Regions:
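A residue-level marker of the well-folded mature domains of exported/periplasmic proteins
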Residues: 23-196
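Hydrophobic helical h-region of N-terminal Sec-dependent signal peptides
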Residues: 12-17
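Bacterial N-terminal signal peptides that target proteins for export
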Residues: 2-11
Length: 196
């Protein structure tokens, strides 16, 4: 919930700035393309908040496409927005490596790119809005170490392994438990952000 509030705050600031830019009567429409990675309830809520905020500003249009966890589909969605000539791209990359080239392409064509929740493998984007996933992983590792009193076997369940939140959380987790030689990571499994 706190994460969603952070995103809402930054998206509100973004739309306020866009609203100021679109105040003139003859101002062209400002087109925003949103390339979501999935269709889960958290993403639906984010999409609803983006659309709700856009309603407050004349001259701003938003089109949202979801890749349904498919890297190829998301790359097609971003190409679609590039070809359409959007003024801003908001992207939550399904997986970092497959999405890096297409995000870099948009950025190099002068389209501002805001990455939300998930990064790519380069710095070719305008802004990132999201959590410090390394710190989250480190905090979990310290919690596990404390709970196990510095000794035991651990199985790590990660999010989608190619996504930056999962990669950064794993790095933070490993950094924390590496301080405890009697804690062993005996297995790691990709849970793909699913609860089951």
């Amino acid at each position: 919930m706190i994460e969603a509030m952070k995103y809402t705050k930054w998206i509100t600031v973004l739309f306020c700035l866009l609203g100021l830019a679109a105040c003139r009567q003859d101002a062209p429409r400002f087109r925003i393309g949103v390339a979501q990675c999935s269709d889960d309830s958290w993403r639906h809520k984010m999409n609803d908040e983006i659309l709700r905020e856009a309603m407050f500003y004349d001259g701003v249009s938003v089109e949202i496409r979801s890749a349904a966890d498919d890297n190829r589909k998301q790359a097609e969605d971003v190409h679609y927005f590039i070809d359409k000539g959007v003024d801003l791209l908001i992207i939550s990359a399904n997986e970092a490596a497959p999405m890096t080239p297409i995000v870099e392409e948009a950025y190099q064509k002068g389209i501002p790119v805001i990455l939300v929740d998930r990064k790519i493998l380069s710095d070719k984007y305008t802004a990132y809005i999201g959590a410090d996933n390394y710190e989250i992983g480190r905090a979990v590792g310290n919690y596990i170490a404390s709970s196990l009193k510095g000794k035991g076997n651990v199985v790590e369940l990660t999010g989608l392994s190619g996504s930056t939140p999962a990669m950064e959380r794993h790095q933070g987790f490993m950094a924390a438990i590496s301080n405890y030689p009697d804690i062993k990571l005996i297995d790691k499994a990709d849970a793909a952000w699913e609860r089951e």
